[in-house]
């Protein structure tokens, strides 16, 4: 016997289909809004990722941006040299040429007078160049894991003649490498692959982390940044804690947080360039005494990745891991393209469309 739907049943079926269609459309619309939370300990490269989004997905740095970053470059450069000078005393390193002591006093005086954001005078520039060329300063620089030094110190100090020029304008790379502590939450908007991204960069130092809670609602994915090169360094805010151990502890608390049960987690093992150089001289056993492998980039990076992945206690949660160099625009462009594809697939799956 045939099964004929009554008019009422047909109307109910049409209503059901319409509701399902609306739900799917709502799902697609929701899937187009992506809220990304950029987390990680201090100095892991989060703010550099944000700057890259400005280069890749917006119009890069404006004339006003360049103007604002210029004093930051001056400050980062002279503050880095002053940090090495101070460490000379702490570590008991002698200058190659004793006459450099007068140069070091000039540098430290400029910093103590808070004139570090101003263009370098000809006299100051000469003093800085002599200092950076000193064998004792270079020896102290090579021991930078024993004190706190900006990652970009060598980059800036190798460019002193360019940065010290009267007509100096910061390049894109100069701006990418600037270091300013993030306080509070910085929000960035951009569109990519028909998705509307809202990217939240949150201060990573311990004092800033209590502010993260405000960002927890409706997060599409978390990008968690780790400085691979921090494995043999201690924190700025607590010189008894290894930076990599701090990142692992933080990742554990984020990955297994009740707020993020259904949130995709993307792990950026960042500063791979610095790590590749450092691992040749500084063994991974400084951080992981039980590490059995060789001190090659491939083996050591793979071991660190395993340490982070093992913190995930949810059998249904996948950690998407990428080795990154946040100052390399091409690398970040390729990685972010892959991250976006993961987000699209996961969003569609969440809407039952994939």
From Swiss-Prot:
Annotated residues for binding of GTP: 43, 46-48, 152, 176-179, 270, 273, 325
Gene Ontology BP term (one): response to cytokine
Pfam families (alphabetical): G-alpha
Region annotated G3 motif, chain positions: 197-206
Positions of post-translational Deamidated asparagine modification: 346
Location within or outside the cell: Cell membrane; Membrane
Keywords of this entry: Cell membrane, GTP-binding, Hydrolase, Lipoprotein, Magnesium, Membrane, Metal-binding, Myristate, Nucleotide-binding, Palmitate, Transducer
Positions bound to Mg(2+): 47, 182
Covalent lipidation (S-palmitoyl cysteine), chain numbering: 3, 351
PTM (free text): Deamidation of Asn-346 converts alpha-1 to alpha-3.
Free-text activity regulation comment from the record: The GTPase activity is promoted by GTPAse activators, such as RGS14, RGS16 and RGS19.
Lipidation (N-myristoyl glycine): 2
Annotated region described as G5 motif, given as residue ranges: 324-329
Organism superkingdom: Eukaryota
EC number: 3.6.5.-
Domain G-alpha: 32-354
Residue segments, region G1 motif: 35-48
Gene Ontology CC: cell body; cytoplasm; dendrite; GABA-ergic synapse; glutamatergic synapse; heterotrimeric G-protein complex; myelin sheath; parallel fiber to Purkinje cell synapse
Region (G2 motif): 174-182
Enzyme class, first EC level, given as a word: hydrolase
Function text: Guanine nucleotide-binding proteins (G proteins) function as transducers downstream of G protein-coupled receptors (GPCRs) in numerous signaling cascades. The alpha chain contains the guanine nucleotide binding site and alternates between an active, GTP-bound state and an inactive, GDP-bound state. Signaling by an activated GPCR promotes GDP release and GTP binding. The alpha subunit has a low GTPase activity that converts bound GTP to GDP, thereby terminating the signal. Both GDP release and GTP hydrolysis are modulated by numerous regulatory proteins.
Family that this chain belongs to: Belongs to the G-alpha family. G(i/o/t/z) subfamily.
Quaternary state and interactors: G proteins are composed of 3 units; alpha, beta and gamma. The alpha chain contains the guanine nucleotide binding site. Forms a complex with GNB1 and GNG3. Interacts with RGS14. Interacts with RGS16. Interacts with RGS19. Interacts (when palmitoylated) with ADGRG3.
Name of the protein described by the UniProt record: Guanine nucleotide-binding protein G(o) subunit alpha
Gene (name only): Gnao1
